[in-house]
Amino acid sequence: MPRKAINLTCKVEYLSILDETGKLDKKLDPSIPDDLLLRLYRAMLLARRFDERMLVLQRQGKIGTFAPIKGQEAQVGAAAVLEPGDWLVPSFREMPSELWRGKSMESVLFTYGGYNEGGYIPEGINNLPVSIPVGSQTLHAVGLGYAMKYRGDKSVAMVFFGDGATSEGDFHEAMNFAAVFRTPTVFMCQNNHWAISVPRSRQSHSKTLAQKALAYDMPGIQLDGNDVLAVYAGAKEAVDRARSGGGPTLIELVTYRMSMHTTADDPKKYRSEKEVEEWEKRDPIVRFEKYLRGRNLLTDAGVEEMDEDVRNEVREAEERWLEQIGKGVDPLDMFDHAYAEMPPSLRAQKEELERELSEKKR
Amino acid sequence: MPKINMVQAINLALSQEMEKDDSVVVLGEDVGVDGGVFRVTDGLIDRFGPERVIDTPLAESGIAGFSIGMALYGLKPVCEMQFSGFSYFAMHQMESHAARLRWRSGGRFSVPMVLRAPYGGGVRALEHHSESREAYWAHTPGLKTVIPSSPRNARALLVSAIRDPDPVIFYEPKALYRAFREDVPDEEETLPIGKSQIVREGKDVTLISYGASMRPVLEAASELSARHGIEAEVIDLLTVSPMDDELFTGSARKTGRVVVVHEAPRSFGPGAEIVARLVEKSFLFLEAPVRRVTGFDIVIPLYQRETEYLPGPERILKAVRETLDF
């Protein structure tokens, strides 16, 4: 038998629309309306300020370990493409997207402050709660997609995960299921170059993460993850395709974790300052701001006013959160929502704790 | 009432629930065209089509996580693990997400799925095809672990499991799949999850078991009665977790003597929990130490040695006699 070649074409596109100086590639302009451009800018700025504030709160001991998102704010470009009926399936570095989709800042503070309430997503918001085991949530977005298709709903599930997640089995199982069943799922990989201390180069031998789509015969694309216009344009293409029955897409957002993995680690131990400085030049907010100023959509006064405005919004959210936690929590409600109906053996344990607590009070 | 075996009874539960409720979907490896390696899902694909009876890629974690996503959207997936020995891939999804999403979201989301898996020895199978690891699931807060012991209760419990708003692990004793037939009514029948049953009344000793071990237990109870005039009260747990201890602790207060039987390894097995609850709730009524007749703390051997591993009537009878003579 001869050796025969099966020709597979693998061409991974890299899309960047705004360069580091904020200059637009006109041919690629996604023509986003001005008011949406400003909303995106404001959402990125809000996420940055909130992130900075949480770092302060963590250092002051007011919240526990938290995972900063600094540098990854352009992800809102992807969330902005979704309709309210679509589903956002986040991991733990999607605060900007979650806020865009209606989650409150208090809710984020609840989670990092150690309150279960952070996961209590209000009715009407189709965000799943944060999923911490890396990569495991990818499968949920595929099941959601299958169910949407089964019900004849023209909705889409967008799942976020990091570069480290592409090493997990669940990611590959999810990609495979999504491709086999052609589910309306958009895989949004935030390649921020570091999985705690392990660099992207040690995570996978592949040149790009987007090329992993080839193995599952689905479209894969790399986007400049620090360019909100590219993120928006690439996500829109994938979401439109999924919505019209064209199946799943893998998107690799090439971005950078400018801060630590969580407040429990020190990146100086494993990466150089120089590398961080290089990426700071590509800051997604600075670049976008330059572009908007260039288009006269933002002025010095406008930037200042908006910054003041988002800082106030963060402060007000923090105040609301403090007021709510000030009321204290009832430890006995830890037993709630374990099951739809509490089994007798669990009820007995709750009563046991109740007695202990009331004895302590006396 | 037609007499059917457990495979047919489970098939009946699935097909009737699918008929009633279009949110019920069946998925797993070979469950469609092939009808499942044990033929449990035989014919379903012809009746309900490939969108509802889904042959999935071979990936247990994938099947479980995919089912979770479907359930979050309001479907009621019934997924099959081809053998419980391969379900450990799925354990992460069940432990980390299926069991917690209701809790994590404060009741906003729920995962009304069923994970079915044939478990246990007695069918002369290869390695990984005969084990009994229900304790893994039973130890996980947020899951329910149900194990039927007859065609009729398998059908009724599976209907309840499908309708349950929380994730249910449904372990099917494969040794009983075709072991005997029973009258199973065609009309709807359910059994409450979380409730055990007294299947034989007696005053001298209490035998507590579930699943595949119910057969040797009932055999031993008949022999005790016929040959020795000893009347054993037999309790079938039906749900391992959350455990219903009301019936068995009550029975222990009456008889004062208890033997617990299961195939699972002894240490940290469901029997350990049963004994703990007996000590907590019936200690002063016990006339003898509680005995456990179980699998040993080893991997279940390949089938030339499994008869000696599995708790059979002889071992049960010996334990009962020692308990009575104490």
Spans of model-derived segments:
Chain A
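Short, histidine-centered active-site or binding-site loop motifs used for metal coordination
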Residues: T21, F92-E94, C189-N192
